[in-house]
Amino acid sequence: MAKFDAHLKCSFCGKSQEQVRKLIAGPGVYICDECIDLCNEILDEELIDSQGGSRQGAEPSRKAGAAQARKSTKPAPTLASIPKPQDIKAFLDQQVVGQEAAKKVMSVAVYNHYKRLAWQGDGKGETEETATRLHKSNILLIGPTGCGKTLLAQTLAEMLDVPFAVADATTLTEAGYVGEDVENILLRLLQKADMDVDLAQRGIIYIDEIDKIARKSENPSITRDVSGEGVQQALLKMLEGTVANVPPQGGRKHPYQDCIQIDTSQILFICGGAFVGLDDVVQKRMGRNAIGFMPTEGRGRGKATRDLQAAQVLRHLEPDDLVRYGLIPEFIGRMPVSAVLEPLDEHALESILTEPRDALVKQFRTLLSMDNVQLEFEPSAIEAIAQEAHRRKTGARALRGIVEELMLDLMYELPSRKDASSFTITRAMVEEHTGGKVLPLPGSERQQESA
């Protein structure tokens, strides 16, 4: 057999197999070693040119980025700059209606947390007093949907002027499974801080729906619970305080990237959840049936009554009850501060509509004032909106949906009306679920006749 086949040639330079050292075959094509070397040289030259240009262009941007980072980095809190618990609660009162016990608990916990940060970074010499290490106390909020758990955490971050990130525990899974890694929570906080690590390390993270990662039974299971107990295990070190490696582009879609290190020991974690059925666990532990907490005439009423009774039962909550519910003891130990939020009654919903700084009534008044229309709500209309929201049983979240539905026709018609300078919402409009049906529109009869 011949050593070389004269019919085989390089598809690029045309040299035969005899004229080159190596001829590599592909699907219907051939390439010689000389062409491969030439291709490598071309690629190397283009790579060097592109890197040189990027370096020249990136140098000023890097300097600008460093300057921006220095500009955005805020100094560490000092003892004098931290608001006192009473001041914190007074600020919460402006935004959150009710929940007095929860606001008091959170005010003290947040004050102690940032006082701890100031104590560690005050620059004093090492003494017997300053050598004492202060450990942080994360917060667990328990309450029905729409009672103000997220708003409490968000208002605290607004007052302290620190980055605030919200995460959903239901999307978290263990590493290696479909879903989000726990490190993505830190990435959201870092993004809120404009990638300023020092600022992010003084921020607040709120993890919602934390009750959804409770394991299905109190006893350990032989099957893998990747979104329940597994997530609790993954969150332990982050809650306690560790130096976590955070991929700036997300870890699963971009595995090959430099990670940013964040120390979580200074981040305040607030976890919230509805914990449906937890009151039954407490009653079972205390050995009392429903009669012990609810009179006979109170049983059989609506969901609002049951939620109120559940909040009263949860005042006797102990850590062992959370273990029976499905949280592992190690996780509970890292959430030493807990607060139970009560369901909102009709009176509280009326206050939410009018009293807070960003109340819904004030928001819609501002919107219509831009169209030179003065909007008013009759007290009976406010009462009717609160009653409807209470009937829907979704807390304060129902208020916006009701008002949006009520204001749809008005906000469609009034901006085009030149003769409308004021408008009043009545109870009848609320009960009919629209303001447009009772709004007299000039020319509407002529439009109907022409139609």
UniProtKB/Swiss-Prot annotation:
Q: Does the keyword Ion transport apply?
A: no
The protein's UniProt keywords, in alphabetical order, are:
ATP-binding, Chaperone, Metal-binding, Nucleotide-binding, Zinc
Q: Which InterPro entries does this one have?
A: AAA+_ATPase, ATP-dep_Clp_protease_ClpX, ATPase_AAA_core, Clp_ATPase_C, Clp_protease_ATP-bd_su_ClpX, ClpX_bact, P-loop_NTPase, Znf_CppX_C4
Limits of the ClpX-type ZB domain = 1-51
Q: What's one Pfam family the UniProt record gives for this protein?
A: zf-C4_ClpX
| Taxonomic superkingdom | Bacteria
Q: Which GO terms describe its cellular component?
A: HslUV protease complex
Establish whether keyword Glycoprotein is in the entry: no
The ranges of region (Disordered) come to 50-80
- An MF annotation (GO) of this entry: zinc ion binding
User: Which positions bind ATP?
Assistant: P144, T145, G146, C147, G148, K149, T150, L151
Protein residues bound to Zn(2+): C10, C13, C32, C35
Any Gene Ontology biological process? proteolysis involved in protein catabolic process
| Family note | Belongs to the ClpX chaperone family.
Summary of subunit composition and partner proteins: Component of the ClpX-ClpP complex. Forms a hexameric ring that, in the presence of ATP, binds to fourteen ClpP subunits assembled into a disk-like structure with a central cavity, resembling the structure of eukaryotic proteasomes.
Describe the task this protein carries out: ATP-dependent specificity component of the Clp protease. It directs the protease to specific substrates. Can perform chaperone functions in the absence of ClpP.
Q: Could you identify this protein by its name?
A: ATP-dependent Clp protease ATP-binding subunit ClpX
Record the organism: Synechococcus sp. (strain WH7803)
